[in-house]
Regions:
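Short carbohydrate-recognition loop motifs
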Residues: 45-59
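Short coil-to-beta strand junction motifs in C2/discoidin
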Residues: 91-100, 197-202
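Short beta-strands within extracellular/lumenal beta-sheet-rich domains
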Residues: 58-79, 96-98, 162-170, 203
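Extracellular/luminal beta-rich ligand-recognition
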Residues: 107-149
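Extended, low-complexity, turn-rich repeat/linker tracts enriched in Gly/Pro/Ser/Thr and Asp/Glu
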Residues: 84-95, 119-121, 189-193
Length: 213
C-alpha cells in the first residue's frame, strides 16, 4: 500500500509543479504625460496636479487609448494611477452612485464607485464599491487607496485629503492585433452649477504590457 501511495506521489509531482511561465514581456505603451503627448488618445486633456502633468481632470467625460499592430501575445497588463478629486460620495443618494469605469475593447473590466467622505473609526459611513465592482456596499470611503494625503483641486482644494490616489493594475487574456483602453465616469451632477469643480478624476503613469506565455 505504501509503495502505491509513493508511486502516486511521484507520478503527480510533475503535474503539480507545472505552471505557465512568461516567455516575453513587451511594454507597448508608457506615458507619464510630462511631454503632453496625447498620440493615439481620443478625448484626452492635459492638466496639472500636485506639481505634475496628468491626463484630466474629467467630469462626465472619458478618453480612449487605441493601439494597433501589437506583437504576438497571450495576456495584457494595464497599470496606471487614478486620482479621485474632491466631493465623490460613493453610493450616497441623491447624487450617487458616483460610478467610474474602465473598459477594454468596449467591455467593462472595472465598474465601481468611489468616495472621499471622511469616515472616523467606529462610524457607519456611506460606502464605496471599490475595490469590488458596483453594487457593493461593504467598503468604507478610500478603501484600497494608495495615498489619502493629497489636496483637492476645486470644491475641496483647501482640504489636505481632498484627492485620493489609487494604483490600478489589471491583467487579462488578450490575443488581438489591436486594443482599446477607455476610462469614463457616470456622475450625476445636474444640480451643481460647476460639475467639474464638485468632483472630477484624472490619470497618470499609464503602462500597458503585452505578455507572451
Amino acid at each position: 500500500m505504501k509503495k502505491k501511495i509513493l508511486s502516486l506521489i511521484v507520478f503527480l509531482i510533475p503535474f503539480l509543479s507545472c505552471k505557465q511561465h512568461v516567455h516575453s514581456e513587451v511594454v507597448i505603451y508608457n506615458n507619464d504625460f510630462e511631454s503632453s503627448d496625447l498620440t493615439n488618445i481620443t478625448g484626452g486633456i492635459i492638466g496639472q496636479f500636485n506639481g505634475s502633468n496628468v491626463m484630466g481632470q474629467f467630469s462626465n467625460g472619458d478618453f480612449v487609448l487605441s493601439l494597433n499592430n501589437l506583437p504576438a501575445h497571450d495576456l495584457i497588463t494595464v497599470s496606471f494611477d487614478l486620482y479621485i478629486h474632491d466631493n465623490w460620495r460613493g453610493e450616497l443618494l441623491p447624487d450617487g452612485p458616483a460610478i467610474w469605469e474602465m473598459l477594454i475593447d468596449g467591455g467593462p473590466y472595472i465598474n465601481t464607485t468611489f468616495s472621499n467622505l471622511d469616515c472616523k473609526e467606529g462610524n457607519i459611513c456611506p460606502p464605496q464599491s471599490y475595490p469590488d465592482n458596483y453594487p457593493n456596499n461593504n467598503h468604507n470611503p478610500r478603501s484600497g487607496a494608495y495615498r489619502t494625503d493629497l489636496p483637492g483641486v476645486c470644491s475641496m482644494k483647501t482640504s489636505p485629503n481632498g484627492t485620493t490616489m489609487y494604483k490600478i493594475t489589471k491583467t487579462f487574456k488578450h490575443a488581438g492585433n489591436s486594443i482599446s483602453f477607455e476610462c469614463l465616469d457616470k456622475l450625476d451632477q445636474k444640480d451643481y452649477p460647476d460639475p467639474k469643480c464638485e468632483k472630477s478624476w484624472s490619470v497618470d503613469n499609464i503602462s500597458i504590457k503585452a505578455i507572451s506565455l
